Amino acid sequence: EAVWEQVQLRYAELLSKWRTDLGGKKNFHNGVGGTYDCIAIMSYYVVCKAITSFREIEEMEENLILPTFRKLKFVDCNKPFWRKLMYRAFVRAKSGCDKWHDYEMSVAPYENGKPIYYEFTSCPAAEFAIRHGLTDIMPALCNVDYASMELLHAKLVRTTTCVDGCRCDYTICGDKDPYLKGHPEYRDEAGFRRNR
């Protein structure tokens, strides 16, 4: 209980010096596993750094995000219908980002038979981590993007993030797509899942 109280105090302290304009309840990025949950996990990490592990933080984020994707296990990104529907969801997400100015997002035009591509050039969670010297734990929060896509019979191909570059890139294709052969996955020295 004392640890939880410290985490809550740290969370309130960190947020008091940061943005309060992230779109409120209507912003899907503020839902379960979203921006504020990431900041809460970072607050936990600050308080419990000596006794927690990278994997524990990664599991916390997975426990927040993955239940929603598990409910969508019928989605198969290998099928054009689902790929097109995912693309439309990303275009809709971009319109929200344009309204809230939290994540700056661009979505490439849809091409039949090709992977979906979008990117964030601004990420509040990454900005928060950079500002507070917490970039070492960001891979544990970002890697869930790979796991969530895998639950949709999709694969994420990523080469950079807003934490260590100027954008967070998302190339998404079906898990059987030949495109993947040219982009093997690996973990970099910081712990980020990436692709070549």
Task: Go through each PLM region and give its residues.
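C-terminal edge-of-domain segments
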Residues: 159, 165-175
